[in-house]
């Protein structure tokens, strides 16, 4: 589903990704963890073309998004191909990013109508079913300003699912929430995992990573320095930096 090889990314003089390679197969849940500033969110944004890599190769569902040219510099496919390939990935951000002037239902149907050209009468039933799935059907006509943070994030998840993605990317989806509200979002994500959705999750929720993820990738200083089965990683991390990190967060 995702095959990223030797990714490099700089912001000015700061090297953010240094030769990152990552493969995720269909139905896998991979947790991306590590200290702040290690490159986790940048990696996610590069996979979804929100940031551009300087070097490296990314394939999504077997299709090339970017590859190196003869000079070793990243060259992307055409913009239309980028849009088509990236449409297969949904992304959920830390801060929800809902349209405040749209109702909950309107937030869900906007992209399928404007991006995929769907008719309102064919997307509304699907959107309503997604709202039932995340437990917010009764809020379909509410505006985001009337929702709690946890409710907003569940709407954001439903909105991403409305585009029928093959892959879901989560960038610290609970980090902006009151601790009392994280559970409702994590339950929704657990449900997606049980339905075999392919997921890459940047998270500081270690219990979720241990219980739900198939694999854990630990990042430090722009590199994946340890990659193992989730339970094995938490029981016996091999890399010194990973051990120190877990001692602080567990």
Give, region by region, the residue ranges found by the protein language model.
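A short, proline-enriched helix->beta-strand linker immediately N-terminal to the Walker B motif
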Residues: 162-166
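Conserved ABC ATPase signature
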Residues: 143-147, 151
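The feature captures the beta-strand-to-loop junction immediately N-terminal to the Walker
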Residues: 33-35
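Short coil-to-helix segment of the ABC ATPase nucleotide-binding domain corresponding to the Q-loop/switch region
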Residues: 102-110
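Catalytic Walker B motif of ABC-type/P-loop ATPase nucleotide-binding domains
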Residues: 168-171
């Amino acid at each position: 589903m995702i095959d990223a090889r030797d990714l490099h990314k700089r912001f000015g003089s700061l090297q953010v990704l240094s030769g990152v390679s990552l493969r995720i197969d269909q139905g896998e849940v991979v947790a991306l963890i590590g200290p702040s500033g290690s490159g986790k969110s940048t990696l996610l944004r590069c996979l979804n073309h929100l940031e551009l890599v300087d070097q490296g190769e990314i394939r999504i569902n077997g299709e090339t998004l970017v590859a190196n040219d003869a000079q070793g510099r990243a060259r992307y496919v055409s913009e239309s191909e980028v849009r088509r390939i990236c449409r297969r990935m949904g992304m959920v951000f830390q801060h929800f990013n809902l349209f405040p002037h749209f109702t909950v239902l309107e937030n869900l149907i906007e992209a399928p109508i404007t991006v995929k050209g769907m008719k309102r009468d064919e997307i509304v039933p699907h959107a309503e079913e997604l709202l039932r799935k995340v437990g917010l059907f009764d809020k379909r006509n509410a505006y985001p300003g009337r929702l709690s943070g946890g409710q907003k994030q569940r709407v954001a998840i439903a909105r991403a699912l409305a585009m029928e993605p093959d892959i879901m990317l989560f960038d610290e989806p609970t980090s902006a929430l009151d601790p009392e509200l994280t559970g409702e979002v994590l339950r929704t994500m657990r449900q997606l995992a049980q339905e075999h959705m392919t997921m890459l999750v940047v998270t500081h929720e270690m219990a979720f990573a241990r219980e739900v993820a198939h694999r854990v990738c630990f990042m430090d200083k722009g590199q994946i320095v340890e990659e193992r089965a989730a339970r094995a990683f938490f029981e016996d991390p091999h890399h010194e930096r990973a051990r120190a990190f877990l001692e602080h967060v567990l």
